[in-house]
């Protein structure tokens, strides 16, 4: 389980000589709180396409730029014939001309500016709009022509300082060989190259900016031999630096988010150090630390700001989650908030939540801690069976996760949590995903910034990718409405439901750049992205579309993708074409993309590597980074829009717009929200103090403010039931929670819960009057005894830690009788409550039967563990028919998951016998000579690996079997796991009992392995009474079952409201067993009215004629005849037969019997 942030770039081999065709390495993991955010722009040499920035136009604090040699370009490229290098056509909708720069060829002298006047769209602008005036200033970083990477930091916050670090990174050596540090104090008009050590060559690998005080900067330098490193510290935005040596090799630094002088250092040998004086002195905190899994305390959540969360390797080689305070980490032992080992790289600390995962016996479990409480299992739908889980969002006290379920390959399902992040409900299926370098996963979902609750996602169904949008955090999703006309005013002929707008959210071929959808917190409702119109998303189509009302209406603005930058809270939109050829045209809009103008930001076409503005998008100054040719120096062009906006905006310069969804509903997330935007006729600056949110009004609650609670699914059968939530077949809402204590009460869910961040009040309350139930005294259930480490084979005299767990039932009043099999017996209380293991060791080799019996006034449970004591498989499941007849052969099958290709020995224990049956096959056949409950236990041993499972079998004299089948749709949702089959059987039993009033203990439904999904229903007879040899009640029960099945009244709900029908199965269509030694036998018995004695005599003779096969026939009534007919059953699961009657009961009429006899 990992966070969704951009991964580190892989190292690629490069030439030994200086070359710019290197793949940049993204700097170490940068938390969201860091001001130095790196923008990696990759120019892909293979295809000649310019890479896209992680967030094009992302104001920075820091940007890393890599320039590569595009296809078709020569290294000798120079500034000759710029017109030949740029032949960008005029864009429809743009002005008929552009403001021209100096007519002389070549770049201006450093710091020399040019003033230009942009021409707007003809007929679309007022007279004042023709006065757009921009100032472009170009500066060349002389002497850095060989440098192939650049990192940029714009301090912001009323500061005019910009720092640029250029460096030559050698891919083969994996290190920086040359570097230059440049500083500007006038918003990028001029730059000064800094000399850190006069007369000494200094190589800077990286620099880090303190988020709590951006004036404080740390440079990390190294010698060419990588044998020593130094830090250069500045407290005045890089005006001066002081050098301090460090006794280790720095891999990454991590500033404290609130306290400006505290910083963590992760070293190349996986050690973690801390400094409280801005890197002057260091203290070792922890060794064997996992990279990128170190976290400072979260303000407002962790009690002490000096706390550090760490994932580290312990002495045994496993990984643990530790916390410690930086002042006494070495003096006191570390605290382990999670008791057991965790998976490497799984620890994530994010806002109020901590996530981790732990895998044992080939099963992965995901845990969450809310506000540093105890870790609990994340409750996904029972049969989601996740293969992977990615954290999408944790804001607004709610968790969004993407889960790849057992039957998914390149898609994930999106789930939304409750407040504590424990219980999850499905909100969107089949979100497209791609796995990138270093096994990082990219999920095609994007949170629209600036408007809470709005998400875009690309859904992949049947190979088609379509874009959907939600305004209420996933409760409802809609397609994007297409514009009626294109950018030239021509009809698009795109009509729903056959045609919609689809957007590229993320690019699968480059994980180090962001998607092409641009949103900003400072510009709510403004979304600009690349995509196409049609029935699905087309990868090679990158037309640019924009919306200024948060996705309600869209307009096409360009035919090709552009780099986009928002300035002054979206008051100005700047765009530069994303292309591999040099250019000099900047397009911009001052009216939210309705009209566009062009500006020549430089006289000579340049290869654009990136765009940057001051952090916060609050100014009207931007910088274009590029280079004239492959061997030229870096060129920075400052574009200043401030002359066009001479005054600060006032209240009369704004108009308001109301947020609505695609249905025109104003109440979104429980409130009506209005925002301010600048009027198109107002030429003014919004400024730093501008706030877009205008008003909000709380709405009354409606059905649409609620979604289905955990364990429930929304029906999709009809519009009238579209908002109805029904319990899933595996979920019983009346069952008390596992932590329900006697004397307390619990709330039974009605199937609905309000979205956590929804603020509606009054109105409809689907959660009203929840059922308050008293916690009953629960009998112990799910009792387990195991050896810590999940093994059942140990060495003699080795300490063994027995762990007893109880999944359900009261623990305070339960007593536990423990027998370790070698003479040690003891009685415990609170054994499962304390979690303390039982320490023991065995002196002699052998097999020991360890048993634990838990008992209270409500009932008891027993767990058995056979311990093999020798010197020390994975998942094991024992499949056995739960009901069998006396002296009837039954097949016991041990299912190993995964199947072990090596030789495996199976040990079978039946009853309390200590002498097992041994087999090399995973199945054995046996008989039970006496009626009663018999426990069957199997162990699978392969080398020193031993696992076991146990089942209870009911051995009876008489019972009846009814074959069942299900709707074909169930096969699609059948993961073919024993637990799934067991749950389906339980729900069928419960439904039949409710419909027929037959006690559940007299009905047992067994779902068979494999496809198609079929089952057998076992109808048990009541206990025999001395005064009656035969009970007519059994006939009535059977008739009631048949009537309920024939009338199609037995069904249950699957995901999406799919209803599964349970019916009688035609035994002729069931799977056949080759050989037929253990199946049902076809026998027809005629019940002749008035000739009962003759019928009984015939039955008796038939039974005597076929020894070893018994038939039981019952008289039903005069209007209906019954016959019993055993038929052959499937190879993969033993269908049981009763001792004195056959395994299938069929009710037929005279015509059916005649057809059967004749056929």
Curated annotation (Swiss-Prot):
BNR repeats: 182-193, 232-243, 273-284, 468-479, 545-556, 587-598
Location, primary (coarse class): membrane
Residues annotated as signal peptide: 1-49
Pfam families to which the protein is assigned, alphabetical: PKD, Sortilin-Vps10, Sortilin_C
Keyword NADP: no
Low complexity bias: start-end ranges: 54-64, 89-111
Tissue specificity: Detected in Purkinje cells and pyramidal neurons in brain cortex, cerebellum, dentate gyrus, striatum and hippocampus, and in glia cells in dorsal root ganglia (DRG). Not detected in neurons from the dorsal root ganglia. Detected in hair cells and supporting cells in the organ of Corti, utricuar maculae and cristae (at protein level). Detected in brain, lung and testis. Detected in the inner ear in neonates.
Marked site positions, Cleavage: 117-118, 1030-1031
Location of the region described as Disordered in the Swiss-Prot/TrEMBL record: 52-120
InterPro entries: Ig-like_fold, PKD_dom, PKD_dom_sf, Sortilin_C, Sortilin_N, VPS10, VPS10-sortilin, WD40/YVTN_repeat-like_dom_sf
Glycan-linked positions: 158, 328, 362, 600, 830, 891, 902
Reported modifications of this chain: N-glycosylated.
Name of the protein described by the UniProt record: VPS10 domain-containing receptor SorCS2
